[in-house]
């Protein structure tokens, strides 16, 4: 039985050395460290007997045939090198950015917002929250109109049209899951933009609450 981890989100923020983590396989994504898009990495321990899925020219030690993206691979290596070199400072900076967002949103939506991310042991670039009773898909659309971009889940699960089994697994009901959002911060995020983002989110939530009240009054 092999243990694989997708450590893409942690690259450049925390120590993801595969041998220190004790994993058998690890994948990384160049885009997460501001490298070339559509370039990935698979690390496998020597004890893992990988079998090729693509036959042909025998590139990449016979494991994945096809012309290699040399420029993309070199770019990925450099981007990862730079991310690791600035890891400690970036972790501290993003922690301040995240705290600025959390302080602002919990002040503006003190009675509405549920912060799902743990305060400790969590990446500084991510916040998971829920506003029960609000349709997160509508919030996402309204925020896009204000040029603020968030998500309702991971990119690989966003289009499945089903509720998050992860949020259900930690005990959230359907109302809380339907109101869940994921906010991420990056290299170009600042404490000021984080505060402004929290303000925009609060404005949209207030707008939706008022819309719901108007619909209820209209129905009566």
List the predicted regions and their residue ranges.
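Pyridoxal 5′-phosphate
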Residues: 1-220
